[in-house]
């Protein structure tokens, strides 16, 4: 007989600094309410993201009814990648009036390649348009 499939109790989505998960909020309370072993998750997440230190890495945690879990790492948010490429701390408070930085289309394509697996796009050109739209909404000008 095939093994029984575990029943899903919930999905938790978090954005945590790579290699820096700890039981403090927001990680502890989010996992605690589902009865997950918090330290076990922190150790597994930190080991999986050690090579990406300095980035915020979104994670989707599937919690099962027997309190076990598994997680899937996503790519860093497009906004964070754009800020890093533009060399600024934060986007514009008035994006369509005040532009805070400029990025080239090559930089946008590079970010699109990184984000491709998480974007709802069929090819790099469509993904680049999505990233360019994010840049515009942050007050970052995209130069052709």
Swiss-Prot record:
UniProt PTM: One or more lysine residues are methylated.
GO-annotated molecular function: large ribosomal subunit rRNA binding; structural constituent of ribosome
SUPFAM superfamilies named among the record's database cross-references: Ribosomal L11/L12e N-terminal domain, Ribosomal protein L11, C-terminal domain
Pfam families for the chain: Ribosomal_L11, Ribosomal_L11_N
InterPro entries: Ribosomal_uL11, Ribosomal_uL11_bac-typ, Ribosomal_uL11_C, Ribosomal_uL11_C_sf, Ribosomal_uL11_CS, Ribosomal_uL11_N, Ribosomal_uL11_N_sf
Gene3D superfamilies: Ribosomal protein L11, C-terminal domain, Ribosomal protein L11/L12, N-terminal domain
Database matches in PROSITE patterns: RIBOSOMAL_L11 (PS00359)
Any one GO BP annotation for this protein: translation
Membrane-spanning intervals of the chain: none
Keywords: Methylation, Ribonucleoprotein, Ribosomal protein, RNA-binding, rRNA-binding
GO CC entries: cytosolic large ribosomal subunit
Subunit structure, interactors included: Part of the ribosomal stalk of the 50S ribosomal subunit. Interacts with L10 and the large rRNA to form the base of the stalk. L10 forms an elongated spine to which L12 dimers bind in a sequential fashion forming a multimeric L10(L12)X complex.
Function description: Forms part of the ribosomal stalk which helps the ribosome interact with GTP-bound translation factors.
Family, as annotated: Belongs to the universal ribosomal protein uL11 family.
PANTHER family tied to this protein: 60S RIBOSOMAL PROTEIN L12 (PTHR11661), LARGE RIBOSOMAL SUBUNIT PROTEIN UL11M (PTHR11661:SF1)
Protein name listed in UniProt: Large ribosomal subunit protein uL11
Originating species: Nocardia farcinica (strain IFM 10152)
